[in-house]
């Protein structure tokens, strides 16, 4: 068992050079720890809704240097391969004759997305305000809301929503957007 610093540079400040290491290029670090079964975990103390191997996007560099005085180890790590962050959603819905969509959405947030979801929930005044924000954002009505692992120190959150949503209808036609819920609302590459 050991722990050590992994020194790196934020994504917005450039990469660490291979050929001429320089302390001036270092501007941040995360802690690496190895358990008895040789599994390495990485921790960042700067985020409030973090977990083992869940690092903020700005630290997901492809070149970070492990520096260990006790083991005399120095090696490169790709921190962008440490965690798997994703949102998996399964929607099962029925279109009713009146043009409404009634269904259930099961979502699993993992990694950074679980942290963002926790942060969003903590920012809401209470659970009613959180549900109202969800309804307003995607223009639907939540009939039942259930969630697991909200308070746990866990890299995943499971969410189950029973919902109804009104589709656009004219005299004889019902117009349905196949994207019942927005998968992206803002461009993440815009600053």
Where are these regions (language model features)?
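Single conserved hydrophobic/aromatic residue that forms the stacking wall/gate
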Residues: 2-6
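A sensor for short, sequence-defined functional sites
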Residues: 7-191
